[in-house]
Amino acid sequence: MTLKQWLVVAALGISACTPSLNWREVRPENTSLKTLLPCKPDHGSRSVTVGQQDMPVSMSGCEAQGHLLAIARLPLPPGATPEQAMQAAKQWQEAALANFKGQVTGTQTLQIKSKDAPNPGPLQRISATGVGPDGKPMQSQMVWLVHEGQIIQAVVYAPKLSAEVTDTFFAGLELP
């Protein structure tokens, strides 16, 4: 085998062992928001306590390279004012941080792409550290926005976050 042939075989072997992310465009049900996920999403629902009230939340998400990525949607009550929506989003944020004993470690401004929909303006991409269900340290980045009568949460959890994963995920958020 020549050196060139050996290098080709070695490169193919290395690439076969290197996990790659297969980013795909996803539109979670009941929203016009588009996002990128590195794997085929699963869908589910559960209740989340927001303020003093249990609220139904629909989720779409998947796991890839040790990261859990999800889009969650909480419908607002009919006739909710913008102030009530923002208060509910803040309460959901507090509940999400409390669920994994999270402490905010930083924030970044995030501007979501928008073609025709009213742009929600700059959002806060929150970084936090906490404890996972297994009792081990967990990192997270999350953002909330109010759109189409619902609060939308985009979130990534991992023992150690990869900037490639989080940056691609949040950059992929887009309104129509």
Task: Name each model feature, range by range.
Residues 13-16:
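C-terminal motif of bacterial Sec signal peptides marking the signal peptidase cleavage site
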Residues 1-7:
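Bacterial N-terminal signal peptides that target proteins for export
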Residues 25-49, 53, 64-65:
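Post-signal peptide N-terminal segment of mature Sec-exported envelope proteins
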Residues 18-20:
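Bacterial signal peptide processing site
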Residues 141-148:
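A short, surface-exposed beta-strand/turn
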Residues 29, 38, 113, 129-131, ...:
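A structural detector for beta-sheet-dominated domains
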Residues 47-139, 151:
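Conserved polar/disulfide-associated segments of primarily extracytoplasmic proteins
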Residues 41-42, 88-104, 148-176:
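Surface-exposed amphipathic alpha-helical segments
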